[in-house]
Curated annotation (Swiss-Prot):
Belongs to the bacterial ribosomal protein bL34 family. It comes from the Bacteria. GO terms for cellular component: ribonucleoprotein complex; ribosome. It holds the Pfam family Ribosomal_L34. The lineage of its organism: Bacteria, Pseudomonadati, Pseudomonadota, Alphaproteobacteria, Rickettsiales. Keywords: Ribonucleoprotein, Ribosomal protein. PROSITE patterns: RIBOSOMAL_L34. GO terms for biological process: translation. PANTHER family: LARGE RIBOSOMAL SUBUNIT PROTEIN BL34M, MITOCHONDRIAL RIBOSOMAL PROTEIN 34 FAMILY MEMBER. GO terms for molecular function: structural constituent of ribosome. It comes from Rickettsia bellii (strain OSU 85-389). This is Large ribosomal subunit protein bL34.
């Protein structure tokens, strides 16, 4: 059976990267919440 997680750094960056987050209003909200919480890493 094929596993669900097939790692790819390119897909990871495109889907969860900083620029992907900044591209949408909801993504910017995620970054805002993570900054408020004091996360060391904001995105992938």
């Amino acid at each position: 059976m094929k596993r669900t997680f097939q790692p790819s750094n390119l897909v990871r960056k495109r889907r969860h990267g900083f620029r992907a987050r900044m591209a949408t209003a909801s993504g910017r909200a995620i970054l805002r919440n993570r900054r408020a919480k004091g996360r060391k890493k904001l995105s992938a």
